[in-house]
Structures are given as C-alpha cells and as structure tokens.
C-alpha cells in the first residue's frame, strides 16, 4: 500500500485527487502500477485540472495499472489508495483479479464517489468473487 501512495504522490498531477494502484502476483511480485491522469497521448500540462472540466480526460489508477501490467493478472491482488468506482470494479472483475485492498472509501472531500457508488462497487466485487479488504496497516511514504 505504501508503494501505491508513493505512486499517487509522485505521478498524479491532479491537485485534488491523487490515487495510486499497484498490482501484485504470486509472492507479491509487482505486475503493474498506475495513477489517475490522462492517457499518454494527452499532454497533461495543457489540461484544465478544475472540476468538472478534468473528468472527461481522467483515466483511473486501477485502469492504468491494468493497462500497463505485464504478466497474468488472474488471481492477482490490487492495492489502491481509494475504493474503486463501479466501472473500475467491473474492469478488475474482467481481468479476474481476485483481491482488492483499498485504503479509503473516498478519494477526497470533493470526490464524486459516494455511498451509493461504494455499495455498487461492493456488490460487483461480491458477485464477481473478488475479496474486498480495507487496509488497516501503517503507510510508509
């Protein structure tokens, strides 16, 4: 989880919401990582980072981690600094990632993630057989 926070703080240019994800396989071998931000083809220096203008350009950290992973994600574990939204949880299920460890329910106070989307994410995880665990340890960044 500490690596997910490091990735978020180091690479996300979003001034309000910095989310990081790390996917690990057997023996905690890293398979991929990601942060919230625009696709590589969009220069993030040219973006309006205010809400809601930024939303149309954002790729969530979970999707970036999946897209930039190497190796088989089946049975992998995803560590993420905030609860995945329902769309991300569907992608996690599509790649058969079996465990998601998250730190917070909300990314930040202005986040559009709310109780109803949290419940949807939990329902998708349960239906897909994904173990959903709230991280309770210490973070070292």
Feature roles, as predicted:
Residues 1-141:
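Zinc-dependent deaminase catalytic domain
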């Amino acid at each position: 989880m500490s690596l997910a926070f490091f990735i978020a703080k180091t690479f996300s240019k979003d001034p309000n919401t910095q989310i990081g994800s790390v996917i690990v396989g057997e023996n905690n071998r890293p398979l991929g990582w990601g942060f919230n931000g625009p696709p590589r083809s969009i220069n993030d220096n040219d973006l309006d980072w205010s809400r809601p203008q930024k939303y149309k350009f954002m790729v969530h950290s979970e999707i970036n981690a999946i897209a930039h992973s190497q190796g088989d994600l089946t049975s992998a574990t995803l560590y993420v600094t905030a609860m995945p939204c329902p769309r991300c949880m569907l992608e996690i299920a599509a790649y058969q990632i079996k465990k998601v460890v998250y730190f917070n329910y909300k990314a930040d106070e202005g986040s559009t993630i709310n109780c109803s989307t949290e419940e949807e994410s939990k329902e998708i995880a349960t239906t897909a057989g994904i173990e959903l665990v709230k991280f309770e340890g210490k973070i070292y960044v």
